[in-house]
Amino acid sequence: IESKLLSEFWGKPMYLGAHVLLPEGFDEHPEAKYPLMIYHGHFPSDFGGFQTTPPDPGMDTTDYSSRFGIYGYNKIQQQEAYNFYKQWTAPSFPRFLVVEIQHANPYYDDSYAVNSANLGPYGDAIMYELIPEIEKQFRGIGQGWSRFTYGGSTGGWEALAVQMFYPDEFNGCF
């Protein structure tokens, strides 16, 4: 979306984006409204960790990950992504929207999701422009009790920051 708040701050059109993972059965239940799980990361290009097919059984497992000290890491990663897909589409899995926010600024791929003197009102733009638009388009519940935020690395700090700066807009973070 084009952000009015950020465009005014920067003096040119500025945009916020998001990837939205819809729950299984979204189209079959047009009356349903959903809670949001909002992920903070560094400008994700897509939903990593989500794969609709299992890994090739003949996939090479001689690759070594020094970070984890194991062989076959790529196959493990693909298997876990497929396992997540199977869970996500299972009848007993809870239904919610997963949102990955894209909030690049002119200097970096991440605004840190807060208002600042040098980058502008990114926190307010995300909270009061982007999230309501997502909830409108994808039938979010639209209440603070129905939103949860999380992230890894810097995104973890961002999740904590938005929970602190917008305590009535989120029901928790990790």
Predicted regions and their residues:
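Non-catalytic cap/lid and distal C-terminal segments of serine-dependent acyl enzymes
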Residues: 1-174
